[in-house]
Amino acid sequence: MGFLRVLLLCLLVIRVMVLVGVTGGGAHRPPAMYVFGSSILDVGNNNYLPGAAVGRANRRFNGIDFPASIPTGRFSNGYNIADYVAKNMGFACSPPAYLSLAPNSSGPLVQTALSSGINYASGGAGILDSTKREVHFTPLTLSLSLKDPPEIQNRTACTLQVSIPVKNPPYDSSKWFTRWFSLTWRQRVCGPHVSAKGGRNAGNTIPLSKQVQYFNATRTKMVAAVGPHAATTLLSKSVFLIGIGNNDMFVSAFAEQARNRSAAEQKKDAAALYADLISNYTATMTELHAMGARKFALVGVGLQGCVPGVRALSPAGACWDGLNDLSAGFDAALRTELAGGLSALLPGAAYSLGDCLGFTRDVLADPRASGFDDAAGACCGGGRLSAEAECFPNSTLCADRDRHVFWDRAHFSQRMASLIARAFYDGPAKYTTPISFMQLAQSS
C-alpha cells in the first residue's frame, strides 16, 4: 500500500505539472477552480451539515433536470451558476462539494483539489458570520409545534418555522401569514394542536470565513502532496470563483424595516453596513491571495427585491425597491473598492466582477427577449406566485421550467443560471468589469 501511494502521488505531481504547463498560453482551461459563496454556487455542501435547521436542496423536485433527475443539493432544477462557469472555462464538470470528499482523508480530497478544484460554497452563507444566524425574508420567526391529536397514534410530532414580517409596508403581513400557514399545514401530516413561541431561526451554514479556513486546510495537504512550488504555481493559474452577499442583503433589509428608523438614519446604517461588508470581502480576497490565489471571478449580488419570495409579500406582487436599492448600493461600493485599491492590496492579482444585478434587471425588463414567459413567480413551490412555500416533493411544479426565470422562491432556474454564466464569460462588456471571465481565465 505504501508503494502504491507513493506511485499515485508521483503520477499526480506529473499531472499537475502538465496542467500548469499547458494552461500558461491560454489555449486550455485553468488547472483548477475553487468556489466560495452561498446557495447560488452550492453544489451540495449543505447536505452534509448536521441538524434540522439547515437549508438543503436534497429533495424533489430539486434536480429534476439534472442527469438521472436526482436532487444533488443544488438549489435548482438542474445545474447552477458554478456549474456553468466551470463548463464555460473548459471543465468537464463542476468542482465537487468539499464536504463530500471526506475532508479528513488526504486521498480523494487532494487528488480532486489538484486536478479540478473544490467547491466550498454553502446555502445561507453570508459575507458576515452573523448572517447565518438570521432569517431570510424576515427577522422574526414563530416556531409552531404541531402534535398529533389523541385519535392518531404512532406518529411523530413535527415543527414548522413560520416567518412573519414585523414591519414591512406596504405589505399585508397578516394575510400573507394566513396563506403561508394554511398551505404549509396541508403539506404536513400533523395534527391540529398548535403551540407557538417567538424566536430566531438559528439555521446552520458554512460562513465565508469558515470556507476560507477549509481551503487553507486543503492547500496545506496540496503542498504536502506535490511540494510548495507546484502547488503555488497551480493556484496562481487557477480561478477563484466567489459569489456571496445576497443573504446579507436580505437580513439587513428586513432588520432595517423592523427598526423603523428615519431616512437619514437608514442612509447612515447602509453606509456602516457597506463598510463592514467591504472590509470582510476584501479581507477574504487578501487571505486567499496570501495562500496563492491570483485570479478572482466575482459574482455580484442580485436583484434581491424581485425574487418571488419577496414579491409574494406585496399585494400587487411588486418588487421591493428598498431591498433592490440596498443591493445596488453594496454593488456600487464593491466596484469602487476593487477599482481603486486592488492592485496595491493584492500585487499580481486580477479580477472580473459579474453584474448579476444588472443582468437580472435587463431580463426582467423584457423576459420574452431572453425566452422567458414568467419572470415573477417560482416554478416550484405553492401559493401565490408559487412562492409562499418552499419547493417540496408535493409542491406545484410549472409546466415549462426553461420558461421561468426563477426555480423556487429565492433561486434562479437552471436556464437563467446558464445565461448569467455565459454573459459573464464572453457576453456584452457591460456585464463584467474590468475584463470578462474568459479574459481572466486565459490571462497569464
Feature map (PLM): residue ranges:
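Conserved active-site regions of diverse hydrolases
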Residues: 2-444
